[in-house]
């Protein structure tokens, strides 16, 4: 696997792109259910099929630049093609996330994260997912 990603940030905006290619006699193996540590490890799709080529574009915004610290937005689009199955197949995924972490007061560190995933593939049936996460940061030291 050869994988690379570049990002550029300015005034609260972050723009990025990446490319990944796999080669060999099979897709990337998962050992004991391990996770792939690559930008292609998206919300639903993994983009690690035999000979698959994947490109990704992403955008993020930190609303602290507008005076709203703790509020962030990000979105990304991944497109994989030339993966081998019984035929040459393709897949794509679009992810979006809106998150907020309370910055001060009684609930400082409490966060809520809304995620939307849309996945389409020739490998399997397409899937959409909406998720909500609640987090709480606790300083140990």
Residue ranges and their predicted role:
Residues 6, 15-17, 59, 73-75, ...:
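Membrane-embedded beta-strand positions of outer-membrane beta-barrel proteins
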Residues 11-12, 64-71, 103-112, 125, ...:
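Short loop/turn motifs that connect adjacent beta-strands in outer-membrane beta-barrel proteins
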Residues 33-41, 77:
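Flexible, solvent-exposed coil segments and beta strand-coil junctions
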Residues 1-3, 20-22, 62, 76-80, ...:
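Outer-membrane beta-barrel pore domains and translocons
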Residues 57, 96-100, 126-141:
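Outer-membrane beta-barrel "beta-signal"
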């Amino acid at each position: 696997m050869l994988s690379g990603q570049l990002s550029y940030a300015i005034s609260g905006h972050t723009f990025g792109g990446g490319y990944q290619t796999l080669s060999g006699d099979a897709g990337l193996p998962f050992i004991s259910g391990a996770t792939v540590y690559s930008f292609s490890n998206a919300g639903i799709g993994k983009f690690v099929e035999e000979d698959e080529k994947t490109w990704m574009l992403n955008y993020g915004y930190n609303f602290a630049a507008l005076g709203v610290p703790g509020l962030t937005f990000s979105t990304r689009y991944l497109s994989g093609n030339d993966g081998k199955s019984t035929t040459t197949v393709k897949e794509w995924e679009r992810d979006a996330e809106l998150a907020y972490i309370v910055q001060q007061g009684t609930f400082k560190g409490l966060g809520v994260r809304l995620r939307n995933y849309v996945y389409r593939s020739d490998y399997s049936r397409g899937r959409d997912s909406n998720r909500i996460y609640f987090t709480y940061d606790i300083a140990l030291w």
